[in-house]
């Protein structure tokens, strides 16, 4: 380490961590610490040669030696001859180290115990054996000589003395760290490496291979990093500078000390005692014990509690060792390097500031004065109001009137940053211009509350002052609230009115029958507004008015258009504040929260930021004013209980009684009864809610003609809910419907519902039941917040180094985007999915593939989305970060539009962190619970047919059918789909159709809305013949392989195949089958699985499409569906689900081999005759039959899919589709919109590593994990040299694993498992290139993203320039002195330039 005084050059590009050799430790040290004393208890001066010695570590006071002979600056650098202290600043006590010479070597515990044990790997010994040697339990042979002993053999005392008697001093055996050190010194790295390289190809067993390649890697790491193995055992121990382990006097003569001092004291005491014992040549057993104690005390100093019991202090808590100092949330990394406290900041409670403009915040005068103090002093001085800083300080303290004027000048156009914790995404920290206010609370603009997730129930916010010019510039240009209108998560406006504002706008945009002024016609908008102002026209009256609109086309040309519109008077108030260029239709509707959001979005896209901001402000003022005037309030009479409620509940009670009776008679089981009861009550609850909403939603009113007319209700509660201002249907249901079913704390549902609502009031029992749910809610919220925060932290960590680094990587690859379909319905149109992305291939017209509609490389904006929609395009290829070709970072073409700005993403945008925040921020809104679905609820909802919603044309896809005798088509393919298109050819619906369904329409048929197009039996799985012919039974014998079943209802008898376990031993190997002799004379065998019910008789003629047998589907029992946050975490951690789906490993024909106990042998044979077999447990339901052809990656046995299988069998695009859709499903359920891009960014990071399957001509081995980018570069190099490239498979790593496997050890160490990461890095001598954001924050530099990217670029160019200059200077052979001075001035110039922000 360089001391700050030695003016070192702090320009560096990478950091390396290695083992410290004894010489290096000596070179750091300024002297040996010989005594355990700290300071003299009388004089409080440090003891000489002790842990705080001034001679070693430097003076305690600035420029003053210990004895006081030399004081003041002029003696700087003098070493006092009396006390030996160098006269210099006391700061050197922070970086001068000392050392302790150990009397006996000591093994470093990290390299011993941190798994895998490095010492163990190098010596090829088990940890247990090494520990026995180290802690003096047994001897180890280090030099066998000519004896029968072997090197590395362990001997206990008895064996050792026997061997001594037998061989004398022919051999050497030692114990303790000394022995281990000798053995490590003896290792010949090159020889061992060569031996292993020869041995590896010959080994057969996987475990041996793994161990050998691990050992080889470690040996090579030692060889390449110039670390010596024996350095893992220390002879000399460095001592931390004393100011980093301070001794602080408390009042009452006591001291607070760092735990490290205690730990060092123990080491020094034991070391000195050992030295003395060795001088006295004490008995072996005593010395041995002392050496063991020394080893233990050094262990405790380095990592307390890693081995044995942790050493505790006086108060019984374990002492904090050096390792504890750096790890964990309170450790050096997370507490001090990644999270620092910030000066020039304050915090206070927030209150609403409804009069502010969007870019302003109200700052209390007192706070402002404190925050801007230095600036205020400066202004007072420069205006001559104060002569000295001291005078200015006095004026500010007295708060004289001039001070406020100066403060106002200082604050003008000097933005401040407001931050609300928890800062879950970048909008939690925004810049505002301060407005000075009285009082002590910060005023916040209501529209930014959504972004901060703030409310005014006592929330606090922090204020920070950007000091430098660059910081102010950045705050204004990038962080100002007016520049953050769109949410980075989905590109929709986040500056959206909510609550009162929505209520006000909704109220004035609603029409009411027979309002004052109904039917009036106005020539101009102003005329109508005057009428409203003079109370001649009510805001809810329906009127006609002449409106002039201005249309602006793409080139900016304006055209005016006047027309008469039917509207509501209040909507003109909104039209009055709308910017020029917007159409009247956009505000001529009921202003619910959704519509207001649409309005602001459209305003942003049409007329730009500035207008939108002003419009949003005006909307807010209007909304607040009108909400006040509307007089909407809430009263108990607004909670109207539906008259039908009583009747609905009576019906339900009767149904429940019936089920209870059935249960008592034994017709249904207890589980079924419970499920059915719960089912009835949840249906009833919905019925009551519907009746209530229908009742609330309309009013009867007398119109102008005196007749009764129905209109939308003006009930206050309904208005609040309908507008989206406050309250949901579910909450109103509890007020005026029925409370319904409650859950117990364990998540199970209590079957007696609460039939009352809050208006009627609850009985004691009902109240007690509902307390359950309320408590669970609070406990859940606390858990959820912690879990969600941890998910965000893992996401940020895995994606932090992903930055846009270039404009275009030139790749042709991408993802195929299709509309998102669920339950046959299109939930997300293609246009919504591809908006803001770049096309990867040309998009052609549907009817003409030669004609290009959109060329490749086009950024799809709103205009193009319309084009896609109008041309009925169903799928298009777009660029994606997953397929981006750049090694570090991604290119802006693959990323597309920056969602928060609405244009193509800038170079330097840190998209990784943005993605992590966008996914993590809504985490708190997701549920934590696992859904128990089962019983009546799920079995009732089994589909058995498909009915289309809208009319259109049916298209069959992947469909293989046979014509049945009854004229229907029967499907005999697995992944058949029916798509429905409208008259323009746009896809409207899409359905998956199961194997064995009857299709009731033909391809290209026109179908009507509501028509059933396919049906099937949901409870059995059919075996269908594709050919006509004669069926013959093979090995189907009653009593052996089958049994005759008689159907009670119909009296028909049929064969049922017996399961293997139910057959007699002689019939176990028989394979029951139906052999079909087709009319063409071919023979087709259909093997029958267990429990098949045969539907044909022996020798019967069958038609194509006939069902030969049916396999009953096991009715799905209660399945737990993991939902919400845990599901998202599972997906990103790439966990293998339990009982996951089994997929076909290759394309080929299926056959079943000999069964083993409990397993079926499943075989696939491909065209080349290659065979893949696997054993599948018998209880798994296999979807394919003998002789069927399956495609690679096709699902054979149902279950949740395993992402690793998808990657291996179907490739990375299929994997991306799967993860994106699964994650989106969870968020969609909660109504949260996140752009797919963000999820893709995380997937890219999960796919960074590859596993090597064949090393080719490289020095990698099978099973190595390497970065994808490195392998690409390596292969390019190998191919250029005509060598064999490396073969590899892409790996999918969970986010935690991926974060720890990152190239940067600083980033990994600051994430988790600090000890393990640092140990591994030190042994291999790892170099951190400081590419990511985190590493740069840790070393205290600007991050290489955003404005920092330019800084780093400039820095690199300067460094290169310097090197060139150096070469030139060498060439001119200039004298060294001028050279040095040049560089000093050069550095200064560069520093100045940076400070002025010229870069």
Curated annotation (Swiss-Prot):
Record key words, sorted: DNA-directed RNA polymerase, Magnesium, Metal-binding, Nucleotidyltransferase, Transcription, Transferase, Zinc
Annotated Pfam families: RNA_pol_Rpb1_1, RNA_pol_Rpb1_2, RNA_pol_Rpb1_3, RNA_pol_Rpb1_4, RNA_pol_Rpb1_5
Residues given in the record as Zn(2+) 1 binding sites: 65, 67, 80, 83
Record text on cofactor binding: Binds 1 Mg(2+) ion per subunit. Binds 2 Zn(2+) ions per subunit.
Binding site for Zn(2+) 2: 809, 884, 891, 894
Gene3D superfamilies: 1.10.132.30, 1.10.150.390, 1.10.1790.20, 1.10.40.90, 2.40.40.20, 2.40.50.100, RNA polymerase II, clamp domain, RNA polymerase Rpb1, domain 3
Catalytic function, reaction form: RNA(n) + a ribonucleoside 5'-triphosphate = RNA(n+1) + diphosphate
Cofactors required: Mg(2+); Zn(2+)
Family annotation (InterPro entries): DNA-dir_RpoC_beta_prime, DNA-dir_RpoC_beta_prime_bact, RNA_pol_asu, RNA_pol_N, RNA_pol_Rpb1_1, RNA_pol_Rpb1_3, RNA_pol_Rpb1_3_sf, RNA_pol_Rpb1_4
GO biological process: DNA-templated transcription
GO cellular component: DNA-directed RNA polymerase complex
SUPFAM superfamilies in the cross-refs: beta and beta-prime subunits of DNA dependent RNA-polymerase
EC number: 2.7.7.6
Binding of Mg(2+), residues: 455, 457, 459
Uppermost EC category: transferase
GO molecular function: DNA binding; DNA-directed RNA polymerase activity; magnesium ion binding; zinc ion binding
Annotated function: DNA-dependent RNA polymerase catalyzes the transcription of DNA into RNA using the four ribonucleoside triphosphates as substrates.
Family: Belongs to the RNA polymerase beta' chain family.
Quaternary assembly: The RNAP catalytic core consists of 2 alpha, 1 beta, 1 beta' and 1 omega subunit. When a sigma factor is associated with the core the holoenzyme is formed, which can initiate transcription.
Annotated protein name in UniProt: DNA-directed RNA polymerase subunit beta'
Species this chain originates from: Psychrobacter cryohalolentis (strain ATCC BAA-1226 / DSM 17306 / VKM B-2378 / K5)
